[in-house]
Amino acid sequence: IRNNMTNHRSIKRETGMGVEAQLDWKENMHYTLNTGEVIELNIFALVYSYSRYRINFISLTKKQGALFHYLDQAFEAAGGVPDILKTDNMKTVMDEARTEYSSGKVNAKFQQFANDYGFVVKPCIAGKPWSKGKVEAPMKLWDELYAYNGKLNYAQLNEKVMEINERNNCQVHSEIGKIPKLHIQKEKDFLSPL
């Protein structure tokens, strides 16, 4: 009997210091503020692959200007720029999706942004989210925000995101056995300067 199930598990590959960061959004979370207003929020997520250091920002938009702003802030917070930025096929990055049969086409503005910072854009193959598992795996952590539904204003919600992010960066990471906030200090020496 032949098994037609495809196993999507991949061999875990650790990247070197400063080599890669993975970018994604936790998208379209409906959240009720303490005023009763329902907002749709997104969480920008960047994970440095070696140290697993995470940088997250809350946003009401995923437009390209916001993406550039958050990447600027993230690179500054981490202390440098990785060689490669791994991303999915989000419209603010890609004009044409990368597939198994096509390399895709990076958006001209995003490519200029990448050139200015000196990193290579590496889009994942469409439909294969496990190829950027370092940023995908922690996304479920943001469901914790629903425990505060109706209790916080936008500024407090932003503070809560920063608090959760800091807590996660200060805990021993289960895969690498190190604390990301301390481990990024080693990785900084291998990141390109701002």
Predicted feature locations:
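RNase H-like polynucleotidyl transferase catalytic core
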Residues: 109-111, 115-132, 151
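Mobile-element integrase/transposase regions
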Residues: 2-54, 62-69, 115
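Active-site-proximal acidic segments at structured loop/helix or strand boundaries
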Residues: 139-194
